[in-house]
């Protein structure tokens, strides 16, 4: 058997059975040796076939040329030398028999050990084939199935993430539009507030102008009243002076009375026309100023009312936009929180899937290590079996050498005992043996060992001729 390195080596194993016959009574038995690689001992080892048998209890000498049995004569012989040689030979044979029995026991133990190792080898080979054919495929199938599930879940999570990102982008655009609208409304509000401040300033200026005009009107009215009073006093003074002059100058008055009266009437009419004209001009100026101020006040009041309405409307719009922005901000925060939760969940699931993949890889590595260990054990068993086969072959050669060495004194002892014989012819006996040979071939193909077994039946015929002493 050669080392498994790609060359084909065959190992033939057969079963052996020990048979022990009765102890020899007269003389040591003979050993029959077959021409094949198997050997059989007439006293120690029997053939594997049930048809083979061994006869014990008679000493057989060398086979005669004609196959006839030679018998000793009935006369008395001198067996003193033969008895001494026989005793010495018996002692030697007993020692050799004991050694052969020990060798036979060891050989039987080796055979049992080889059978046990073959059974273990077959079991390990079955486990190895099962592990090689099923476990890696099943582990690979489980890994591929889990990887497909992980890829499908990753795709689902990726689509969900894309959808959430699209929603987030849409909400971000809506939020940006609302922020821009809010900025525009805030700018409009600021413009309205600025216009309101300007309008308030104009109203204040108009109010101050109105108050100033009212004060001017009051001063003019006071001046008119003062002028009226002054005119009346002048008229009274003039009348008093005229009356005094009338008392003093009665005659003069009598002569100039019509001219003075006419002059007084003219002066009165002139002053009255001047006063009426001044009063009318003051009233018209006051009315025009009052109308202008009233129109300005009305215009300012209307502008103020419109500004207040616009401010209220802007305030309502700002409040509604603020509420809408707050709602959108809350929605955005909820979506961001949901996105973070999805990312965390995705990270956890990805970590779990990576841990599962690592666990499966570790199991696959352990299975590969176990397969390698089984292969090493199988190789060690093959090495042990090869060593046992070598040892068995060595013991076989030793037994064959001992058998050939022991057969020499038997022939010499038989030649000493034979003198004159009367030949009696007996038919030769043939022993048929059938042996089942198990041929196991171990080949190495692409780094893998392939073991094939076959059984072969061998037939052998052993001619046995009776011998006598």
UniProtKB/Swiss-Prot annotation:
The modification 3'-nitrotyrosine is found at residues 16, 378. Gene3D superfamilies: 1.20.5.170, Single helix bin (1.20.5.500), Vasodilator-stimulated phosphoprotein (1.20.5.1160). GO terms for molecular function: structural constituent of cytoskeleton. The modification Phosphotyrosine is found at residue 469. Belongs to the intermediate filament family. Class-III neuronal intermediate filament protein. May form an independent structural network without the involvement of other neurofilaments or may cooperate with the neuronal intermediate filament proteins NEFL, NEFH, NEFM and INA to form a filamentous network. Assembly of the neuronal intermediate filaments may be regulated by RAB7A. Plays a role in the development of unmyelinated sensory neurons. May be involved in axon elongation and axon regeneration after injury. Inhibits neurite extension in type II spiral ganglion neurons in the cochlea. This is Peripherin. It comes from Bos taurus (Bovine).
């Amino acid at each position: 058997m050669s080392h498994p390195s790609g060359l084909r080596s065959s190992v033939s194993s057969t079963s052996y059975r020990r048979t022990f016959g009765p102890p020899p009574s007269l003389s040591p038995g003979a050993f029959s040796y077959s021409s094949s690689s198997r050997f059989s001992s007439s006293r120690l080892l029997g053939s594997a076939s049930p048809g083979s048998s061994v006869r014990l209890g008679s000493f057989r000498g060398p086979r005669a040329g004609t196959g006839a049995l030679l018998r000793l004569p009935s006369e008395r012989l001198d067996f003193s030398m033969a008895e001494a040689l026989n005793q010495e030979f018996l002692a030697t044979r007993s020692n050799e028999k004991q050694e052969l029995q020990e060798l036979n026991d060891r050989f039987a133990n080796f055979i049992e050990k080889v059978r046990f190792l073959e059974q273990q080898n077959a079991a390990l080979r079955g486990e190895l084939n099962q592990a090689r054919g099923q476990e890696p495929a099943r582990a690979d199938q489980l890994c591929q199935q889990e990887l497909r599930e992980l890829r499908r879940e990753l795709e689902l999570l990726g689509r969900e993430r894309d959808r959430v990102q699209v929603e987030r982008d849409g909400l971000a655009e809506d939020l940006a539009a609302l922020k821009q609208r809010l900025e525009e409304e805030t700018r409009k509000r600021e413009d309205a507030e600025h216009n309101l401040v300007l309008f308030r300033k104009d109203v204040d200026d108009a109010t101050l102008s109105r108050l100033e005009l009212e004060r001017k009107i009051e001063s003019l009215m006071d001046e008119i009243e003062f002028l009226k009073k002054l005119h009346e006093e002048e008229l009274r003074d003039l009348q008093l002076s005229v009356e005094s002059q009338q008392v003093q100058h009665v005659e003069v008055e009598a002569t100039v009375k019509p001219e003075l009266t006419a002059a007084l009437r003219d002066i009165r009419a002139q002053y009255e026309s001047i006063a009426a004209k001044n009063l009318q001009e003051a009233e018209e100026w006051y009315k025009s100023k009052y109308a202008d101020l009233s129109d300005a006040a009305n215009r300012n009041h209307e502008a103020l009312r419109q500004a207040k309405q616009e401010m209220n409307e802007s305030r309502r719009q700002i409040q509604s936009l603020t509420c809408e922005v707050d709602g959108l901000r809350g929605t955005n925060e909820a979506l961001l929180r949901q996105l973070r939760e999805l990312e965390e969940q995705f990270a956890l699931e990805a970590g779990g899937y990576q841990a599962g993949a690592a666990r499966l890889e570790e199991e696959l590595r352990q299975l590969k290590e176990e397969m390698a260990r089984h292969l090493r054990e199988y190789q060690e068993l093959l090495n042990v079996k090869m060593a046992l086969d070598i040892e068995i072959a060595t013991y076989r050669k030793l037994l064959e050498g001992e058998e050939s060495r022991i057969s020499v004194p038997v022939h010499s002892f038989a030649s000493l005992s034979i003198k004159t014989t009367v030949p009696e012819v007996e038919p030769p006996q043939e022993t048929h043996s059938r042996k089942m040979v198990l041929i196991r071939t171990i080949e190495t193909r692409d780094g893998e060992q392939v073991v094939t077994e076959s059984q072969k039946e061998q037939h052998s015929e052993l001619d046995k001729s009776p011998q006598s002493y």
